[in-house]
Amino acid sequence: MNSDVMPVGNLTRDQVRTVMTACAAAPPARNARPWQLVCTPTALELRAVLPLAEKSADVPAPDRRELLLSCGAALLNVRATIKVLGAHPAVRLMPDENQPDLLAVVQPQAGFAATPVDVALAEAIAQRRTARPPAGGIPVPMINRLRQAARVEQTWLAILAPDQLQDVLLRTPDGDARGHGGPAADVGAANAQESVDRSNVVVAVVGSFHDSPLAWLQSGQGMQRVLLTADAAGLTTSLLPHMVRATPTRGLVRTMIGGGVWPQAVLRLESPAQPSAVRPTSAAVAREEMHRSVR
């Protein structure tokens, strides 16, 4: 993360630090944060870092997709935090084809009143839940809220039935069933398999109507909005990227969710949850600073 912090637009230096802390709390990809948030006098620039900044041909498509999903999640955190600081985040995605590492430009514009939904999302950034909760189903109204959260970001949320999940797991290559840790960890094949028979666990797929770098960046924002909405409602959340890492299994998942949507991210949702005893330091700082900002 860029250490050169300065006022940006109508945001003070301290408010920009709050935004940067929230950005750093986004789920990483393969134990790395492939983005950098850069300050300019009028905007915050989200830029790709290695290996994402390398030529597309040098980075396998599945890896590039996962990295851009992570960048999209960071961008959603930036947008959500700017809103609770009283500004509107005007966003341009991939605005300059001559700067492929420039993923987004976010201009804070004064005069914005955050809604209760905005505040809940911003607070959820610091409330990543990984503790094992007791049994209890996820009600249909909650599933509908998560679907609406995905739609806000021009993405789609589908739920895999237990038999569909079992079929995908049987076809997932062993080499892709590894976990990667982090605040929203890939819990790996073992926990995915466990999800088949647990009534309080739902496996959901975030998808988009296109399959391009821009769609991956957009899908990362949809993924993060769903995760934060679930966290705010007390659900435990984690990522299962191995389920769509290999082309054959990704194609199978695409068929299962109707064939018209490209699966970009797979989420494991468990209900209900309690905040874990240990949180990432950056998330704890973000929560404290955000509470001060919205008082």
Residue ranges of model-derived segments:
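Acidic, surface-exposed loops and disordered segments
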Residues: M1-R295
